[in-house]
């Protein structure tokens, strides 16, 4: 009888520990859920079915900042909650498998690694991008700007249409900073300064 009571006690403890482990991961989240190892066509299909943009982490195996994002940023619950609720998330090594094809397709938008692209699954166009290691809150803010229509593509289109308001110049330069495009930013600032009347 004593052995049965001890076994039941041990089983009860084991069950309690198991429940606590499951609850810990349920309550605290597991960070960003990436569709890893999926074909690009499957990622596009999933995003279209869910009515979401695609968040694509473009990385390489030798990139230190890429590893920093993978270890310190994407696993954070607040980053995972934001990304998982707003995007279909995928990641590709740009030097292997499907990543090679995707790098060729988007190389004009990948100035270095890591680059995080927001892609419209309907036409596979770039909606927004963030380049370089980015802290969790800054990444969420930059991506929220993209969801709010404050994207590099929108600012570029307005600029190319001839708009030169100070507000646009500031927003465009901020988006260029996030996209790590200092050359274009310098040109826009220089053109804006040169366009100012001398008597102002």
Give residue ranges: language-model regions.
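Bacterial Sec-dependent N-terminal signal peptides
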Residues: 1-32
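N-terminal "domain-start" segment that seeds a small globular fold
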Residues: 28-45
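Thiol-based oxidoreductase modules, predominantly thioredoxin-like and allied folds used
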Residues: 33-38, 58, 76-99
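Extracellular/periplasmic catalytic domains that process cell-envelope and extracellular macromolecules
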Residues: 48-49, 81-84, 108-112
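Short active-site neighborhood of thiol/selenol oxidoreductases, capturing the structured segment around
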Residues: 49-61
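Conserved redox-active cysteine motifs that mediate thiol-disulfide chemistry
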Residues: 58-74
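Non-catalytic, surface beta->alpha helical segment in thiol-disulfide oxidoreductase systems
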Residues: 110-152
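Oxidative protein folding and maturation machinery
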Residues: 156-200
């Amino acid at each position: 009888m004593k052995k049965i009571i001890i076994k039941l006690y041990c089983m009860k403890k084991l069950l309690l520990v198991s429940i606590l482990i499951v609850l810990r991961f349920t309550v605290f989240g597991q960070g960003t859920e990436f569709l890893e190892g999926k074909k690009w066509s499957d990622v596009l299909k999933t995003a279209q079915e869910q009515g979401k943009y695609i968040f694509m982490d473009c990385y390489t195996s030798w990139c230190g900042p890429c590893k920093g994002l993978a270890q310190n940023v994407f696993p954070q619950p607040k980053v995972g909650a934001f990304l998982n609720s707003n995007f279909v998330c995928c990641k590709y090594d740009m030097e292997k498998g499907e990543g090679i094809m995707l790098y060729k397709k988007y190389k004009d938008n990948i100035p270095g690694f890591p680059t995080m692209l927001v892609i419209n699954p309907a036409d596979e166009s770039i909606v927004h991008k963030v380049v370089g290691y980015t802290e969790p809150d800054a990444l969420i803010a930059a991506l929220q700007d993209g969801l709010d229509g404050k994207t590099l593509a929108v600012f570029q289109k307005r600029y190319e249409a001839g708009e030169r308001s100070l507000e646009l110049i500031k927003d465009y330069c901020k988006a260029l900073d996030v996209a790590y495009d200092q050359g274009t930013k310098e040109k826009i600032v220089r053109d804006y300064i040169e366009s100012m009347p001398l008597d102002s």
